[in-house]
Amino acid sequence: MSPAPSRPRIRPWLVVGDLALAAAWVCAGALVKLLVYGGLGLGGRPEAEAVKVSLSLVYMFLFAWLEAASGGASYNPLTVLAAALASHGGPAVYLFTAFARIPAQVIGAVLGVKLIQVTFPNVGKGARLSVGAHHGALAEGLATFMVVMVSVTLKKKEMKSFFMKTWITSIWKNTIHLLSSDITGGIMNPASAFAWAYARGDHTTFDHLLVYWLAPLQATLLGVWAVTFFTKPKKIKEQKVDENKIKKE
């Protein structure tokens, strides 16, 4: 008989890793834009997006490696929330994620934006909502749902190849980002969105909270639930059906 899987443990040191990676993530994204539009002078040219995607793939591989090397630190609140929900870690893990890890990521992202703005004053002000709040919430929520579905599915399948897993998720995230970039910026990261909004001074508006927090958080919950439901072993599904029949009788 195989041993029962161990329940996820609370690892306090991940808070430091979350803060550092969140700061580095916003800096990396801003530096890529500076290089493409400023250093290479590709602003407004078709090849600009191709170069951005190529550079994004490079640093997404780097951050995936950093996440693995740190034992699970992350730059995205949606990633740690999805992991906590999918692992069924219990109230302690959920509370640690909500009140320690996610705030650390937000603080890290804010510090990262401040650092990049001080170093490069012409870095810009981040992505903004270009449509109505409800339209934007639908777009950001749908984009998040699609990314979470793929990420959680790959994790549940326990794909051993780091390269293939990272390649699939990176290509998928970049595709969804491009499709939603003209609507909400395709951020799919509440910490990064908050950091840039904080720098602009519009981080407490209803539109920001709805589009970049409520919609993606709800989409994450729905995505984890959907993957968990559709990837349940057949025996468990049949057992639940039988139990329901017995109750009705």
From Swiss-Prot:
Annotated membrane topology: Multi-pass membrane protein
Which Pfam families does the record cross-reference, listed alphabetically? MIP (PF00230)
Q: Where is the signal peptide, in residue numbers?
A: none
Q: Gene3D superfamilies recorded for this chain?
A: Glycerol uptake facilitator protein
The reply on keyword Membrane is yes
Localisation: Membrane
For this protein, the record's SUPFAM superfamilies field holds: Aquaporin-like
This chain belongs to the protein called Aquaporin SIP2-1
Q: Which organism is it from?
A: Zea mays (Maize)
Lineage of the source organism? Eukaryota, Viridiplantae, Streptophyta, Embryophyta, Tracheophyta
